[in-house]
Amino acid sequence: MPAVAITGIRQTGKTTLLREEPNLQGRRYVTFDDFAQLEAARQNPEDLLSGDDPLTIDEAQKCPELFTALKREIDRRRRPGRFLLSGSVNLLLLKNMSETLAGRAVYLNLHPFHRREILGQTGSAPFLPSLFKALAPSGAPRESPFSGGAILSSGGPHLQPRLRVDAPPPPIAPHELLKGGMPSVCLGEVEDPSIWFRSFEQTYLERDLRGLSQVADLIAFRRVMQMAALRTGQILKQSELARDAQLNSMTTGRYLDLLETSFVIARLPAYLNNRTSRLIKSPKLLFTDVGIAAHLAGVKDLDPASDEPLRGYLFETFVAQNLAGILSAHWPEARLHFWNVQGRHEVDFVIEDGRDSIALEIKAGTRWGEGDLAPLRTFLASSKRCRAGILVHNGQDAVHLGERLWALPMGLVLS
């Protein structure tokens, strides 16, 4: 494509990537964080885009006037990779910009760091895509998805064989959720993460948001952010959120749209391939970074003994953050959903690839019982093309529980 757009929530490292990636050296670089360069582009976008040298434009969404001129220049002279754009908003959700670049740009999302990156595990293939390929549609392994693949022992909580996993990744520690995946925080570049998160929030509200839309009441918008953080990992009930934020539903919906456009939240669609009228069709609300969600929700302690009511939802948000990064980089044809039968069963994540899928139920604790498997059993019974239903727990045992049913460590699933 003549244009490549790299987008993502602010502070994920887009500018660092554009400036320091060796393969991008030698390109002409402008940033619309520089007011002089922004004003020059507004006055004469054609002049900025002319020339044969490859051009990188950082924070491109700040100059909407650029995109019509960009379309004309691409149509005049198409050359792969000629323009590289970055932005802290989802250009696909901005109608005028997405329509202008239709058929002329490819979009890439730079997600917050996932655990594989933080632990330096990116030299190996991720586990989940490998598991999906290793399982036949019936759920029977074509080849072992585990290192070694041998049975360690019979027994365990369900008298099923445990599988050997060589050097399994460690369980997820509470501090991993509180830090999240923003590079400066999760890589230990800041001494006090709480100060960084407060600065992020202030900059987002006072600069990024104002550049995206006219929001008259920033206090009300911040209240919606906080109410949304308290609901991460849960089905979105907009009228209830609006009531708690003391706003009408229309204003609340507009604010949620702005949060989604700027990559602060995502709305996970429901999986609707099952033949039942009782399926929940409303999306699930998820923050794209679990650390930001915990900060906005005021969560300070996620130890099991703390009895934090959001603990399970924040673990689910952490898994979603990791899945988003892994699927984007290694399994782009996969689609992420959740499944809910009204008033009865919910499966936290369904990864769909063509007609086949894998279902994941997230358990924040290390212990689990038969009751935790009920949603997966129901989903497997209604979805014959699901290759595996996996109870993802924060322990270390990998257990095969029967046809298409597994209990696997969260550290392994996200490795």
Model-derived regions, located:
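P-loop (Walker A) phosphate-binding loop of NTP-binding proteins
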Residues: 9
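Interdomain motor-coupling "hinge/lid" segment immediately C-terminal to the ATP-binding subdomain
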Residues: 90, 96-230, 234
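Conserved lysine of the Walker
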Residues: 14
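Hydrophobic anchor at the beta1->P-loop junction of P-loop NTPases
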Residues: 6
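Accessory nucleic acid-recognition modules appended to NTPase machines
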Residues: 186-357
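Conserved nucleotide-sensing/catalytic segment adjacent to the nucleotide-binding pocket
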Residues: 40-84
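Hydrophobic positions on the alpha1 helix immediately C-terminal to the Walker A/P-loop
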Residues: 17
